[in-house]
UniProtKB/Swiss-Prot annotation:
<keyword id="KW-0963">Cytoplasm</keyword>
<comment type="function">
    <text>Bidirectionally degrades single-stranded DNA into large acid-insoluble oligonucleotides, which are then degraded further into small acid-soluble oligonucleotides.</text>
</comment>
<keyword id="KW-0540">Nuclease</keyword>
<feature type="region of interest" description="Disordered">
    <location>
        <begin position="496"/>
        <end position="527"/>
    </location>
</feature>
<dbReference type="InterPro" id="IPR025824">
    <property type="entry name" value="OB-fold_nuc-bd_dom"/>
</dbReference>
<dbReference type="GO" id="GO:0006308">
    <property type="term" value="P:DNA catabolic process"/>
</dbReference>
<dbReference type="GO" id="GO:0008855">
    <property type="term" value="F:exodeoxyribonuclease VII activity"/>
</dbReference>
<comment type="similarity">
    <text>Belongs to the XseA family.</text>
</comment>
<dbReference type="GO" id="GO:0005737">
    <property type="term" value="C:cytoplasm"/>
</dbReference>
<protein>
    <recommendedName>
        <fullName>Exodeoxyribonuclease 7 large subunit</fullName>
        <ecNumber>3.1.11.6</ecNumber>
    </recommendedName>
</protein>
<dbReference type="Pfam" id="PF13742">
    <property type="entry name" value="tRNA_anti_2"/>
</dbReference>
<dbReference type="GO" id="GO:0009318">
    <property type="term" value="C:exodeoxyribonuclease VII complex"/>
</dbReference>
<dbReference type="GO" id="GO:0003676">
    <property type="term" value="F:nucleic acid binding"/>
</dbReference>
<dbReference type="Pfam" id="PF02601">
    <property type="entry name" value="Exonuc_VII_L"/>
</dbReference>
<dbReference type="InterPro" id="IPR003753">
    <property type="entry name" value="Exonuc_VII_L"/>
</dbReference>
<comment type="subunit">
    <text>Heterooligomer composed of large and small subunits.</text>
</comment>
<keyword id="KW-0269">Exonuclease</keyword>
Length: 527
């Protein structure tokens, strides 16, 4: 400062340089406003700078003042400043001589009453609700019996101990704890990152993915619970693919994460109770259900047993079931033998009648036809017998199938009946074979008789058969005239010939003397 007495100034006012005046103002302001409380609305807040300091302004409807929160102070704040929030800032006013500006250096910051915070919460609730983050359709059902539970909370304190103790008492399962800060600067980001981190785990990874999440914190003031009203936390909870239980504060404390979570628990202990059932209760329910099931099974068995007894009483006995098939089988077996015998007799008689009128040269063809017919009838008879036997066996098999469901006391009777049927079948087969053998033997004997009567056997003894042009046998010489063409059949074939004379035998042929009685014939008899 210059000496006022040496100055030539016409006034008594002191003269200051710009620096002197700025420094004097700075000292005056900092002395007068060394500790002040300012109420205003946060404006121009963009979060902490890269240096860690936060720069913004406090304003009301008529004025505005710049504000700064240094890095060390910012980390100790109980809640995170937000644009438009009405707060009460405590600090000191300072100026910058180089720019003639002043600002308040904030040392503590608190909301301007619960009403301001609640108004901010309501505004944020309306905004997020309009996006559908709180819709009931987004809510997921909690798993009945989770294998792994993820807990997002502070690793120290009573909350995690209460949750672990409650889960261990009710139904011990694997618990994964993601430690986070639950209040203060950066706590909201940590909670949101923990929720997203659990969702990023692979179901079959080294660290198992939880089946349900619990986001928990103990009770506190509205400022203490403010991190769970952060938009980043609410969005992470709404986007979680894992069912999420919010357990923040006490039953009367509501935060925005409670609306985005799938289920809200009144306390952290209540969240543990919602996450797992009571093992003892499940065991008791299982035992009760097992007892009911056993009772139902016993009643069903009794009813089925009574039904079987009633069916057994209604079923006929084994002898009654087999009586009709056995009688039919006996009748078929008896009638078959008699029928074959009568058929053989009738065929023999018919053969004898027909054979008396047939020429020897036609006997062989008729015999072949009869033999074929007889063989066909024998085959049909055998097939008929087989069908009768198969039919009887099928009926008995059906009867056995019906009786298979009856108690074991009928098994012995069934075995005896089966053995008797087998004996009857064997005896019937034996009788039929004997009848067929006798029929074949008789047929062979008749065949031999017919062969012996055949004229071809006579031809083998030196005789011949003469046939006219129409292939009719010629039995008298008068039937031929001179020049007639004839065929002569010998035992080894035929030759053609022409007659030279007709009528009586020629005179050159002398009559042979008659064979004396007792002389043996030189040629065998035709018969």
């Amino acid at each position: 400062m210059s000496n006022v007495f040496d100055s030539d100034s016409p006034t008594n006012l002191a003269e200051y340089s710009v620096s002197e005046l700025s420094g004097s103002i700075k000292r005056t302001v900092e002395t007068a406003f060394d500790q002040v409380r300012v109420r205003g609305e946060i404006s121009g807040y963009r979060g902490p700078h890269s240096s860690g300091h936060a720069y913004f302004a406090l304003k009301d409807d008529r004025a505005r003042i710049d504000a700064v929160i240094w890095k060390g102070t910012f980390s100790r704040l109980k809640f995170r400043p937000e644009e438009g929030m009405e707060v009460i800032a405590t600090g000191k006013v300072t100026t910058f001589p180089g720019s003639s500006k002043y600002q308040i250096v904030i040392e503590t910051l608190e909301p301007a009453g619960a009403g301001a915070l609640m108004a901010l919460i309501e505004e944020r609730k309306r905004k997020l609700g309009a996006e559908g983050l709180f819709d009931a359709a987004r809510k997921k059902r909690l798993p009945f019996m989770p294998r792994v539970i993820g807990v997002v909370t502070s690793p120290t304190g009573a909350v995690i101990r209460d949750i672990l103790h409650r889960i261990s008492d009710r139904f011990p399962v694997h618990v994964l704890v993601w430690p986070v800060k639950v209040q203060g600067e950066g706590s909201g980001e940590e909670v949101a990152n923990a929720i997203r981190g659990f969702n990023a785990l692979e179901p079959a990874g080294l660290i198992p993915r939880p089946d349900v999440l619990i986001v928990a914190r103990g009770g506190g003031s509205l400022e203490d619970l403010w991190s769970f009203n952060d938009e980043i936390v609410v969005r992470a909870a709404a986007e979680s693919r894992i069912p999420l239980i919010s357990a923040v504060g006490h039953e009367t404390d509501w935060t925005l994460i409670d609306y985005a979570a799938d289920v809200r628990a009144p306390t952290p202990t209540g969240a543990a109770e919602m996450a797992v059932p009571v093992k003892a209760e499940l065991e008791a329910q299982a035992a009760a259900l097992a007892a009911r099931l056993q009772g139902c099974m016993n009643r069903q068995m009794d009813q089925r047993r009574q039904s079987v007894r009633a069916l057994m009483r209604a079923l006929p006995s084994l002898d009654q079931l087999l009586a009709l098939p056995r009688r039919r089988f006996d009748e078929a077996a008896a009638g078959l033998g008699r029928g074959l015998e009568l058929n053989t007799i009738n065929k023999r008689r018919g053969f004898e009648r027909v054979g008396a009128h047939l020429r020897p040269d036609l006997l062989s063809g008729r015999i072949a036809e009869r033999r074929q017919t007889l063989n066909e009838r024998i085959v049909r008879a055998e097939r008929m017998v087989e069908r009768l036997i198969d039919r009887s066996k099928s009926r008995i098999d059906r009867a056995e199938a019906i009786l298979a469901s009856l108690p074991a006391r009928f098994k012995t009777q069934t075995d005896r009946s089966r053995e008797a049927l087998a004996n009857l079948s064997r005896h019937g087969d034996t009788a039929i074979r004997h009848q067929l053998a006798r029929a074949r033997a008789e047929l062979s004997a008749q065949d031999r008789v017919l062969q012996s009567l055949s004229y071809k056997n006579v031809l083998k003894r030196g005789y011949a058969v003469i046939r006219d042009e129409d292939d009719r046998p010629v039995s008298q010489a008068a039937a031929l005239s001179a020049g007639s063409a004839v065929s002569i059949e010998f035992s080894d074939g035929r030759i053609g010939a022409v007659t030279t004379e007709g009528g009586a035998p020629p005179a050159s042929l002398k009559k042979r003397p008659a064979r004396e009685a007792g002389d043996p014939p030189k040629q065998g008899s035709l018969f």
